[in-house]
Design a protein with these regions (language model features):
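Catalytic alpha/beta active-site cores
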Residues: 70-247, 251-256, 260
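Short beta-alpha connecting loops at secondary-structure transitions
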Residues: 18-22, 298-304, 332-339, 366-376
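C-terminal catalytic subdomain
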Residues: 337-377
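Acidic, His- and aromatic-enriched active-site or binding-groove loops in soluble protein domains
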Residues: 170-182, 264-275, 312, 352
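N-terminal alpha-helical transmembrane segments of multi-pass membrane transport
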Residues: 14-15, 20-88
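Glycine-rich phosphate/pyrophosphate-binding loops
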Residues: 247, 280-290, 326-331, 357-370
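Phosphate/pyrophosphate-binding betaalpha-module
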Residues: 272-328
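Short, Lys/Arg-enriched N-terminal segments with co-localized hydrophobic residues
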Residues: 1-12
Length: 377
């Protein structure tokens, strides 16, 4: 029996099914892209607004330019941090049962997050999200067997924006038992959000052993880390709460116009986030993610349902697997304004490609209108 046939037979015997694997990059190209991303961090560095992060980088040997607020990360420091970042992350539900085993080609879907509007299917219109909508979406997520995690899916407009991050997490913990993908809107939000999670688990030690949430942190393209995103990384690391790094390069707008150039920038921003997280706490759980997009320069819109966007997603995830880091992508969503044939085609193709690529955390189901609207359908 050939090695390939033996591998297929083993997969079928163990799992009952065999899932094809999507690969779009040759190993040589992966190595070249990693090399170019590292070169970006060495020669051009990253802009860092957070003083604690700058201190961590400087103490670890990064070259610091205080006037420009830039840190130039050495090859040795990158190597050191890539060795300590975990290749597997386990996340648990509200009851403390294992829900997500983020490693290898395991695939888990969760709704897209952060929408400002919702599609009102009763009135057939798009309107601002309300608390009532958030609760409906969260309870629906709890009932869907193939959606394995929830997200802080939209931003209710009927509460003050200053407390929206904590309010969303509270509603999620109250209405859904599945693990939560969330994030802070202000630095002050972290402590309250952590306390909510500790209240569910019983202690900080138990929360560290069985994390209930993943915190998104989004660097600003190109190669910039705000005070908020840095602080989120630094706060999550010692608490054992996974951080999901989500760069957002737009081809020709905030990144090089080529797909390869956007991928390299995504890699550089992810690797820089890994470095900051590992300096805050060696072994801190980090997910290598993103929400990149092509860019329509005529309409100034980011087509998330375009095949070019999906190619960037699958490619950077392939590189992350090469580096042995858990993966994330915004896929399985659509640019359509309402649930229709276009939304079905775009979200369906995205979901299939993401699953074939073995992306661990796939955010997107329910998301419409360039990530601005969430729908129950």
């Amino acid at each position: 029996v050939s090695p390939v046939k033996a591998h297929i037979k083993e997969k079928i015997m163990n799992n009952g099914t065999f899932r094809p694997t999507l690969k779009i990059l040759a190993d040589k190209l992966i190595e070249d892209m990693i090399s170019e991303a590292r070169e970006l961090l060495v020669k051009f560095g990253i802009e860092v607004e957070n003083q604690e992060a700058m201190q961590l980088l400087g103490d670890a040997g990064a070259k610091i330019d205080k006037e420009k607020r830039r840190a130039y990360i050495s090859q040795d420091l990158i190597d050191k941090c890539l060795k300590t970042v975990p290749s597997s992350i386990k996340v648990y539900n509200r009851e403390g049962e294992l829900a997500l085993n983020l490693e290898g080609d395991n695939v888990y879907f969760n709704p897209g997050s952060g929408a400002l509007t919702v599609y009102d299917y009763e009135k057939d219109e798009i309107r601002a999200a309300l608390t009532e909508d958030y609760i409906k979406l969260t309870r629906l997520t709890d009932a869907l067997p193939y959606i394995k995690a929830q997200s802080t899916c939209c931003v209710p407009s009927d509460v003050p924006s200053e407390i929206a991050d904590r309010y969303r997490l509270y509603l999620s913990l109250l209405n859904c038992s599945k693990p939560i993908i969330t994030g802070t809107f202000v630095v002050e939000g972290w402590e309250v959000m952590k306390d909510m999670l500790v209240a569910i688990r019983g202690s900080e030690k138990e929360l560290k052993e069985k994390p209930l949430a993943i915190f998104d942190c989004c660097p600003s393209a190109p190669l910039k880390w705000s005070n908020l995103t840095c602080q989120s990384l630094i706060d999550c690391a010692p608490a054992g709460i996974p951080s999901e790094i989500i760069p957002m390069p737009l081809t020709g707008a905030t990144s090089p116009v080529t797909l390869a150039g956007a991928i390299v920038q995504n890699l550089a921003e992810n690797i820089s986030g890994i470095v900051i997280g590992q300096l805050a706490q060696p072994g801190a759980p980090i997910i290598f993610g993103g929400s990149p997009s092509g860019f329509d320069m005529r309409k100034a819109t980011p087509p998330m349902g375009a095949i070019e966007t999906m190619m960037i997603d699958c490619a950077y995830a392939e590189v992350a697997k090469y580096l042995k880091v858990p993966t994330h992508a915004y896929m399985g969503l659509a640019d359509a304004k309402l649930p229709d044939a276009q939304s079905g085609l775009e979200s369906g193709i995205g979901a299939i490609l993401a699953a074939l690529a073995g992306i661990n955390v796939i955010s997107g189901p329910g998301m419409l209108a360039f990530e601005n609207c969430l729908s129950l359908e």
